[in-house]
């Protein structure tokens, strides 16, 4: 359980339990008022030069991303080439889906669908056992090569990659009450695919590697798109049993599993990041941007040089909130050891090589272990 500590002349603290790829860990959190992130804490990076023909321009952005990834693990990106029309359509379709009656939404129940993709209702998820149940509904799909414009013939994908892929299994047939939903979702998913691959090359540059270093590892990626629908938190909400405001969460405190996440959020806000001092800070919406955050696997292969930072969401806006995270990682059939460029002068790596499928299994297993101990 989370415990409080009072020190004379210093802010009160609490210990927050978290799941990780190495088992349960704790973070010391200051009980200080929530505040807005400073520009130096969650920087805004113009990534338009990553599309330039100039290597120097691309490296300049990579340097900025390197700084953000080592200091906080969160940053905004602008001029990302994802059309606003695509985000607007996906946002509108998401609202249309979640505002349906429960019977219509349950046609896409993730428990009935393939590979747990589809809809999850309110009160059915709890990311962190020291906090309340997540006050959200979600709809998600996994990477499907049939939705990937870079894959000319999904039926000819070789082993072992094909073993982990799910062709034509996105649960769109269960959303036929909204004919526009599939088109909006697919367009946005494809835009995120293109952006994620471009950012992967920039991350390679940021680590003093050739831009193409990770290209083959994301040819058939482990990727998913999730739409989160957050009702406003209220003290009388049926799911928010704990009395401590810190435990009432739209999504509980956690880190992400994979390489990085690309997050679109609406104007209502609610995303909070735990900074290095142990303070919760707001990563408020900035129009026309995405938030990018480092995941656990990227922290691992960089020997902890890049930081996978704890974050959560609390929707105190009084309005319905939507966020659309796109989770991005190497293909499940791939593996990666600590990068040589991250081992330092002594050449030591903190971690062994691990297959991505084993990493995800371990990460999920540790999450469930932590929940069971709550």
Swiss-Prot record:
Entry's cofactor comment: Binds 1 Fe(2+) ion per subunit.
Entry binding sites for 2-oxoglutarate: 321
Record GO terms (molecular function): dioxygenase activity; metal ion binding
UniProt keyword terms in alphabetical order: Dioxygenase, Iron, Metal-binding, Oxidoreductase
Residue ranges crossing the lipid bilayer per the database entry: none
Pathway the protein acts in: Secondary metabolite biosynthesis
Cofactor: Fe(2+)
GO biological process: small molecule biosynthetic process
Enzyme Commission number: 1.14.11.-
Segments for region (Disordered): 111-131
Residues that coordinate or bind Fe cation: 254, 256, 311
Domain Fe2OG dioxygenase: 220-330
Gene3D superfamilies named in the record: B-lactam Antibiotic, Isopenicillin N Synthase, Chain (2.60.120.330)
UniProt keyword Nuclease present: no
InterPro entries for the chain: DIOX_N (IPR026992), IPNS-like_FE2OG_OXY (IPR044861), IPNS-like_sf (IPR027443), Iron_ascorbate_oxido_reductase (IPR050231), Oxoglu/Fe-dep_dioxygenase_dom (IPR005123)
Catalytic activity: peramine + 2-oxoglutarate + O2 = 8-hydroxyperamine + succinate + CO2
Role noted for this protein: 2-oxoglutarate-Fe(II) type oxidoreductase; part of the gene cluster that mediates the biosynthesis of pyrrolopyrazines, secondary metabolites showing insecticidal activity. Within the pathway, ppzC uses peramine as substrate for hydroxylation to yield the novel analog 8-hydroxyperamine. The single multifunctional NRPS ppzA is sufficient to produce peramine via condensation of 1-pyrroline-5-carboxylate and arginine, N-methylation of the alpha-amino group of arginine and reduction of the thioester and the cyclization to form an iminium ion resulting in release from the peptide synthetase.
Protein family: Belongs to the iron/ascorbate-dependent oxidoreductase family.
Listed name of the protein: 2-oxoglutarate-Fe(II) type oxidoreductase ppzC
